[in-house]
From Swiss-Prot:
This is LL-diaminopimelate aminotransferase. The lineage of its organism: Bacteria, Bacillati, Cyanobacteriota, Cyanophyceae, Synechococcales. The modification N6-(pyridoxal phosphate)lysine is found at K249. Its cofactor is pyridoxal 5'-phosphate. CDD domains: AAT_like.
């Protein structure tokens, strides 16, 4: 009989969001008339920008002609999209990133997991706690951890707590690590990093030969012009960091799938024999072998994000969701609930009232307010006693959800 990858058996009972879906399904079957409002999983609700839709329609029509048909495209992405990304998202902000260092993909979730393919299994890994579950679970699946303890922490990982007491800013690891995941604006807490804070991380990484995997999926939601959007705005980051970006949240591409990863040329790791190896070469080889590229139609839609019309429309989308976040913050604060985040990110991170545990508060909101959120403990042991609400919903639903919560 074929053997399975037993590392999967080390995973906790269910990935956070499937467990939420299971509880919602059970509740809905018992209460079919309940009008649920979902402020849980970070899926967008507003339509794709018109500029993107029109570009995709043109691309579809092109695909219906002999001269305009496109089959397999470059695994790294079409040059015109990579050039638009490099210019707008990096070069215009003073970052020395060129188009060849951009790898277009179908999601930053995939990339942040797949990047492990090119990194050795003996690397010592650090994550914040709470943390986006994919970072941890993908390492468990790849056999890079031991078993989980009673609190859900896996042997072999270094956990860096972030909480209200430390301003949701992780401290530099006290033990040696080789690889660290950073996410700013942070999912789930909504915290942001200043230039000085990121410079401290970059300095640490360069001094200690650490690779930073930097998730900037929510950079478009930053409201303060003094805050960095990319780690490459920080001196020395090209030598120690890979960055993940996505069109999912700023342009509504959760259902159309387009993202990109930045791997600077000259960024190096060590081989088993101690020689230096460029990570760009390994990632390029990995993508060429395991990925067939994002469809031409979708990439044309993503390219339209960088048009004048597209920029105006995605800015409007971001403003809409950030207004929702402001409403959630205001109403929860008025209800006497301690809130964090929601100022530079579409997530509000709240302290559960009355010392309720995270899943207890989830069930409380589900059954008594018919509102769905995300329990903080699902993001890690340090998330216990916290809860995440997402600003990704209609204004009507956000207003109604807040009315229901305040009525509890």
């Amino acid at each position: 009989m074929v053997q399975v990858n037993s590392n999967y058996l080390k995973l906790k009972a269910g990935y956070l969001f499937p467990e939420i879906a299971r509880r919602i399904k059970s509740f809905s079957e018992a209460n079919p008339d309940a009008a649920l409002i979902r402020l849980g999983i970070g899926d967008v609700t507003e339509p794709l920008p018109l500029a993107c839709r029109n570009a995709m329609k043109v691309a579809i029509d092109e695909m219906g002609t002999n001269t305009g048909f496109h089959g397999y495209g470059p695994e790294q992405g079409y040059d015109w999209l990579r050039e638009a990304i490099a210019k707008h998202d990096f070069q215009n902000k003073g970052c020395q990133i060129n188009a060849e260092e951009i790898f277009v993909s179908d999601g930053s979730k995939c990339d942040s997991s797949n990047i492990l393919d090119i990194l050795g299994s003996s690397n010592r890994i650090a994550v914040t706690d709470p943390v986006y579950p994919v970072y941890v679970d993908s390492n468990v699946m790849a056999g890079r951890t031991g078993e989980a303890n009673q609190s859900g922490r896996y042997a072999g990982l270094s956990y860096l707590p972030i909480n209200a007491e430390n301003g949701f800013a992780a401290k530099i690891p006290s033990e040696p690590v080789d690889l660290i995941y950073l996410c700013f604006p942070n999912n789930p807490t909504g915290a942001v990093a200043t230039r000085a804070q990121l410079q401290e991380w970059v300095n640490y990484a360069r001094t200690n030969s650490v690779l930073i995997l930097f998730d900037a999926a929510y950079e478009a939601f930053i409201q303060n012009p003094d805050l960095p959007h990319s780690i490459y705005e920080i001196e020395g980051a090209r030598e120690c960091a890979i960055e993940f970006r996505s069109f999912s949240k700023n342009a509504g591409f959760t259902g159309t799938r387009c993202a990109f990863t930045v791997v600077p040329k000259g960024l190096k790791g060590k081989s088993d024999d101690g020689s230096d190896v460029e990570l760009w070469n390994l990632w390029n080889r990995r993508q060429s072998t395991k990925f067939n590229g994002v469809s031409y139609i979708i990439q044309r839609g993503a390219e339209a994000v960088y048009s004048a019309q597209g920029q105006g429309e995605i800015n409007a989308l971001v403003s809409f969701y950030m207004r929702n976040a402001a409403i959630i913050r205001r109403e929860l604060t008025a209800a006497g609930i301690e809130v964090h985040g929601g100022e530079h990110a579409p997530y509000v991170w709240l302290k559960t009232p009355d010392d309720m545990d995270s899943w207890g508060f989830f069930d409380h909101l589900l059954h008594n307010a018919n509102v769905v959120g995300t329990p903080g403990s699902g993001f890690g042991a340090a998330g216990e006693g916290y809860f995440r609400l997402s600003a990704f919903n209609s204004r009507v639903n956000v207003d109604e959800a807040m009315r229901r919560i305040r009525a509890l």
